[in-house]
């Protein structure tokens, strides 16, 4: 059987539970046609670069699929019919990547705390107080007539 990565975008106005229902529906289609679904990642609600069918946001989902080609064709056929699916893309891969996808790694990196929690400033020490800056001499102004 061939290996595929399948990403689909669902409408913004459906609930996360409905997105999970769509995932289960398509998992059932793949398993009924002799395939299996490996990793499923829900990337959440993200902004679209441009509007698709009057939607500015979409729920993104990634599925790793190990299935024969007819199973993938059936999933794509059902996604074309479903009004909740805005876009989908299926790519044949040589092997599935281990661990989280690049999008999930980015989310984990973005979730790290910033500012005070980042650690010391090495040998520079804390930042000095800048005061109200009135202690500096004023720059001479040219009077315009």
Curated annotation (Swiss-Prot):
Molecular function GO terms recorded: small ribosomal subunit rRNA binding; structural constituent of ribosome
Alphabetic keyword roster: Ribonucleoprotein, Ribosomal protein, RNA-binding, rRNA-binding
Region described as Disordered: 94-145
GO process annotations (BP): translation
Disulfide bonds: none
A single cellular component GO annotation: cytosolic small ribosomal subunit
This protein's record includes keyword RNA-binding: yes
TM helices/strands, residue ranges: none
InterPro entries: Ribosomal_bS6, Ribosomal_bS6_sf, Ribosomal_S6_plastid/chlpt, Transl_elong_EF1B/ribsomal_bS6
Function (record text): Binds together with bS18 to 16S ribosomal RNA.
Similarity annotation: Belongs to the bacterial ribosomal protein bS6 family.
Protein's name in the database: Small ribosomal subunit protein bS6
